[in-house]
């Protein structure tokens, strides 16, 4: 009997052992044997500042004062946002971890009428850049003359069409007007360049030259679109960002034009360390004088929804997205500065962005070798009205007349989204460890290029490493794929020059569905060699002379830290903390350095902002920090919890409150399609804004004040949330805002296009056309000043 039991136990053990051995997935990565070639001195880029600062560019990264940096750029168009709200938006962008704001100068807005330039109000370019300087925010000015930006004629003035000349060419007549434009821009920028101690570090020349164009707004219904490009380029000009496989017969002409534009910019005084130009899709570049920037859009409105290749790792420097390209990739760093973590909607195509796509796209892009990451758009806005009537929107493309929300991390009215917080994780990591990451090359596993977007089984991963140290990048997200599942039984084996490193040493880990993570290996933490961690690095702060490293625990992965026993004192070299603010442990190096490590939960990390002085604030509110105070913006909640670390309160949670207010709103639906809204909004110092939230199902909606169309909205399954602050003065007189809605037809073209998830669509089983307005509410956005030096006195311990 005992023998039978023993035999069954052995058999059961064998089955379990074989099962787990079979389900264990070991993924291998080999450190390259050949040295990494970095070229220097060949690019006519770089510059100095009056304080002795120096920016330089080699073939792999940008450096400042001899230190590698990874710029994080976030597009924000000053002319699409109210002047009085610029400062707060710039501070929100800064709190999101963005270090550079690119902004367009739309020619047709500034010279709507020939030779009559405007630089006032929302068009005050100089004031915008001066505010950026005030808050240590750097700027790249995109001077056109052609911009696109879903704006009328791509930014070219209407009157240009009347001139007998070739636009976007070296036609002398065209260059006369461009030179005049550049000279006017130069006057606005004078004294604000990096060389002057100012914030302008870059100028972008043109946009998508010989790749893309916009339709001329002066056209007729049913007419074939006539695009804004030289006649000889019309067969090459695409609509939207995409692959260009045609051989550009006029390539040399395009490159000569780009070089001419750069010379005109320089003559206008625009001297900067960094010049950029569109690099994707076979666009014309400026050889050795500008950095080609690349793009990736996972939810493009100009294409039928499908799984993109932009969640798959690659060597992005040598194989840029939307290849082929027209430049030698060995000679330029990878500047992925137009990443579509949001997208604009057009009438016939309304892609709804999954916020997790933003994090996945950027983990993939950074892991693939990008040494600049940036977003178009990072902050949405609204298209202004033309002084002569009509709108600046690119109406032939079906763009909303006013809304340019773009589903950006910061939306049309300044509200931050989930993607804002997800991206902030990556930006904080770059702020603290970008100097280590930038020189690291990308290393890919065998067979990486055979993985298809629809593959749900094979781990998607890559490493960036140098001298056996580096970071692992992994993602289990794919856009337009609702059937992914978690990947279990994972183990990474790194075949390094001096060792074979297995992560984890024992057991396996699971990568949750839609997760994207970055894990360090062989990283020195102030003298202690961290062999690996199954936790993601977030920040490094100095605390009373000690180094404190902040990690986050990815969902579904138990944090484990393994140190090299030769570099730390004591017997303990492995740590398994439970994630949270109470997880801090310490160790000492052989050299006597004290190191602290705290592992936050992912949710705590998502809510973490690193302040200008390096401290961390953990809160669900939006953080706005200027030179003198820190303010928390809270939508609908007058009480907020927060932690500031380090501080005299340690990791203890604090709470701050302001007086609650209950704004009154009355709404009446009239005649089926009309809605009249009257609101009573008290002006209070602790109210930042009021947001009118309209829950409806329909096709399009328009808002009017005193007969003027002031806003519009394309329905896409989510409520319309409107800032009322910008209409305060007008509403004091009119007292009401009127809306007009059009019903949604079951055969609407955007439904057939498939951009809106099925679960968001209404039930058409009972009727073919639906218009429902279920609720209208007015939500206050509170501003809670917690100060900095005296924050403990203004709050109470919770």
Regions of interest found by a model, annotated:
Residues 1-25:
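Bacterial Sec-dependent N-terminal signal peptides
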Residues 86-154, 158-159, 262-266:
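Aromatic-lined substrate-binding rim segments of carbohydrate-active enzymes
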